[in-house]
Amino acid sequence: MSDLKTIAQPYAKAAFDFALANKSLDQWAYMLMTTAEVASQPVILQEIKEIDFKGAKNAEAFTQMFLDICEGLLDEHCQNFVRVMAENGRLIVLPDVLNLFMEMKADFERTIEATVLSVEPLTEEQKVNLVKALEKRLSRTVELDCQIDESLVGGMLIKAGELVIDGTLKSSINRLASSLQA
């Protein structure tokens, strides 16, 4: 786990536990997406990196500006969450907090997103069959994210969490080439 993820972990856990206890997982996911998006903007990110948040008056002003940008999109609890993160100089990890929160949410809801790369668009029947097979293998509800990647030559590449199924023609050709060179 990267340093930023390590720092983000307790914040993500606190947000998740609070959201779960208050039956507001979807609302918190949206609010954290908002804060992560704001924190990822180049101008804001630069300020986050430069400000000393430990008791500085300009840090309070920056935090208020940050919350003003999110005006109407964060409830009181999420605003307090952002303030606590700012007081501890941790706004830089908001994107990591979001990612960890979403992992916890997906784990709790027993869902997983599977990214499918193929040369041509999948038919509805192929999508249905793929979802059924993945749900059986992963024991989770699967949401497909189908993308076109013409560099694959043929076949498909499936990524779901830590599972990677490489059924591409490109991969088969590379394995054949490796075995011929051995």
From Swiss-Prot:
Listed GO MF terms: proton-transporting ATP synthase activity, rotational mechanism
Assigned keywords, A-Z: ATP synthesis, Cell inner membrane, Cell membrane, CF(1), Hydrogen ion transport, Ion transport, Membrane, Transport
Bilayer topology: Peripheral membrane protein
Protein localization: Cell inner membrane
Pfam family, one: OSCP
SUPFAM superfamilies according to UniProt: N-terminal domain of the delta subunit of the F1F0-ATP synthase
Cellular component per GO, a single term: plasma membrane
Predominant cellular place of this UniProt entry's protein: membrane
Gene3D superfamilies: N-terminal domain of the delta subunit of the F1F0-ATP synthase
InterPro entries reported in the protein's UniProt record: ATP_synth_OSCP/delta_N_sf (IPR026015), ATPase_OSCP/d_CS (IPR020781), ATPase_OSCP/dsu (IPR000711)
Function as written in the Swiss-Prot or TrEMBL entry: F(1)F(0) ATP synthase produces ATP from ADP in the presence of a proton or sodium gradient. F-type ATPases consist of two structural domains, F(1) containing the extramembraneous catalytic core and F(0) containing the membrane proton channel, linked together by a central stalk and a peripheral stalk. During catalysis, ATP synthesis in the catalytic domain of F(1) is coupled via a rotary mechanism of the central stalk subunits to proton translocation.
Protein family according to the UniProt entry: Belongs to the ATPase delta chain family.
Subunit structure: F-type ATPases have 2 components, F(1) - the catalytic core - and F(0) - the membrane proton channel. F(1) has five subunits: alpha(3), beta(3), gamma(1), delta(1), epsilon(1). F(0) has three main subunits: a(1), b(2) and c(10-14). The alpha and beta chains form an alternating ring which encloses part of the gamma chain. F(1) is attached to F(0) by a central stalk formed by the gamma and epsilon chains, while a peripheral stalk is formed by the delta and b chains.
Matches recorded under HAMAP family: ATP_synth_delta_bact (MF_01416)
PANTHER family: ATP SYNTHASE DELTA CHAIN (PTHR11910)
Protein name: ATP synthase subunit delta 2
Lineage: Bacteria, Pseudomonadati, Pseudomonadota, Gammaproteobacteria, Vibrionales
